[in-house]
Amino acid sequence: MLIDNLDKGWPTRGASREDILILRSLLGATRKLQRQLERRSVAFHCLVFLRNDIHDLLVAETPDKGKDTAIVLDWDDAEAFKRIVYNRVSGTLTEKASFLEAWQAIADVQIGARDSFSYLVERTLMRPRDLLRFVRRCIEVAVNRGHERITSDDMLKAEESYSEDMLLETQFELRDVYRENADPFYKFLGCNVYISSGEVLERANGDEKLVELLVWFGFLGVKEPRQLEPRFSYEVRYNVAKLLAPVKENKAVFVIHPAFRRALECTG
């Protein structure tokens, strides 16, 4: 039995204790049903799909942890995103092809000196829907320009509208869980990509909880001198405390996520 969309429409980080109680009761019922069917020699397994944030709340609110086995769908690997796009593109090809061949059939493989697919993935919050939205925007631009394939210029143009989409969506998600200061994003308009903790706190009107939420949603990442690349919440399983630890010791700076830079006209 597969159960999905239970948490559809629930705000990010906004599930109530009543919501979690419903989930606990459901899982308890599936275990009971499994035991009853097994006594009749009927094989039965139930798989419940939950968002990461809802699962974390469920674990925190469950006293008897460990009864259910969690399988994490790993979306922090670019190879998984290649598979998503390949499955959608390969059906249009006459011959079986590798991902690179399939991608090359519909788009330029380079943006300047950079791999074009990696460029798109880096501008997502590592969610499949982000990548598919970006690709759709690229297709729209290519079609409007009369191109048979997506060019690198099409991708750069599509990034403008995609970045606006991401900014608005994240703004709506933040409003669902934090109405006290729900529109902080435009305070970062025109800011540098790399920004000190003091400046972030100033732009957030001194609201430390808001800063934590901006990190949790992936709007802000953290860059330490010892690291080549900044890290974002989805790369540490949304462990915000771990990300913020070097910032609080003045050993790191904040970074605006690439998905939002075009919309906010960031510099640097």
Language-model segments: what does each one mean?
Residues 6-113:
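The catalytic "switch" region of P-loop NTPases
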Residues 111-141, 146-268:
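C-terminal leucine-rich, beta-strand-based interaction scaffolds used for sensing/assembly
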